[in-house]
Each structure stands twice: as C-alpha cells, then as structure tokens.
Amino acid sequence: MSLSIIGLGLFDEKDITVRGLEMVKAADVVYLECYTSVLQCRQDVLESFYGKNVIMADREMVESKAEETILSDAKDKKVALLVVGDPLGATTHEDIIVRARDKNIEIMIVPNASIFSSIGATGLQLYKFGKTASIPFYSSEIPIDTPLNVISDNKKSKSHTLLLLDLDPPNDRFMSVNDAISALLNASVRRKDGIFGPDTLCVGCARLGGPSPTIKSGSASLLSFEDFGKPPH
C-alpha cells in the first residue's frame, strides 16, 4: 500500500507536525529509525502520545533487512517510518525510498526541522555554510582526513563548516564536542598541515532544537575543556 517517511524534528514527541501525526495515527505499522539520530524522550512516551506501538528499526533492519520488514509490510499495509530530524537528511532514507518505488509502493514524505536548519540558532548565517562533513568515532585505525579536507576547502571560500558528530544510540554512545575537537587536533598534527589548530575558532552545540540547548564559541583549545552537558552534541 504505502510507506510514509515522517520527520519528527529534533527534541521530543511533540515536535511532529500535524500532518505527520495524522499519518502516524492512520498507519497500520509504525517504525522508528533509531541509529542516525536520537530524540530526547523515551520510546514509551512516543507510543503514549501517538497511540501506537513503535518498532525500533536499527541499521540492519532499515538497510539490509528492509525487504523482509518495512518494505514487506508496506506491500499491503500503511507503514510509517519515523525519522529524527528531516526524512531526507541521510542517504539511508533516500535508498529505502528508491527501493520502495521499485516495488510500486506509494511514498509520502513529511518534512520537519533538522540540524541543517537549527544550526541557525548559533547566529551564523545559513547561506555562508559550505560543505558538511561527519566526524566518526576516532581510533588509530580510522583516520579522519575527510573532515579536515572539507574544512580546508571551505576556508578557501570563506565558508563555515558544519561538522556532524558520530553517535551509536543502541549502545548509548555519543561523540562529544570535546572528543571531536581532540580528534581534529590530533589528525591535523599527524598531517602537519595546520588546517585545525588550538587557535581555530569553533562553535560547539548540544541539544539544538530543544528548550535548553548549549551553544558556546571560542578557540579549539578553550572549547575542548568546556562542559556541553547531555548529548546529542
């Protein structure tokens, strides 16, 4: 029948749009994609507010097992796939849309606020941002060259760089602003390129889109010791 991919916004169960809520209530099956981001409320709170059981969909279910789960249900049921932020903010969701269309499943998209719009709370002008990059959980086996390359390219055009920090919600693991700065400093030292140093001006954010966000600016060395509170950062 149909697959509705519904953005939930960034904070809690009440950030869903009216249209999105109507679609959730009309759905036969409701999934929540739970690995690209996280809401700041519990699953049972969502279920109570929506009046529906919510199936937590991890990476395996959405990507490698979608044919057996989400898309299989959508062949003859109304399925809602809930996504924190905006539905089209990750390539994962674009992939499942393509696969659904290949199966002639009707697709409906309900947008919502995402980090790409909420970053405006920093006071930085959105049109002055360049390419975005992600910082993965750092280890000696995983060099983080891409973020530094993006920062370098954006500097040449005098553009800001939005860096998205890694997270692993099923295992309650979230990268902090402090860890991200440390990873960038270490990588830049390793490369000996000076792209990101202790004096680099940064803006660190946590819990954007909620009632108590933390936004702090300063040099990398200063922010590396600041407390940004609970995730997500």
Predicted segments, located by residue:
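Class I S-adenosyl-L-methionine
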Residues: 1-106
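A contiguous loop/helix-start segment that scaffolds small-molecule binding in enzyme catalytic cores
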Residues: 3, 78-79, 154-233
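Generic hydrophobic alpha-helical segments
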Residues: 20, 66-70, 147, 151, ...
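Class I SAM-dependent methyltransferase SAM-binding "motif I" and its flanking Rossmann-like core
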Residues: 85-161
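A short acidic, often aromatic-flanked loop/helix-cap motif at beta-alpha or helix-coil junctions
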Residues: 60-66, 115, 170-171, 210-212
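Short, surface-exposed amphipathic charged segments that create phosphate/polyanion-binding patches used
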Residues: 68-75, 121-126, 144-150, 215-223
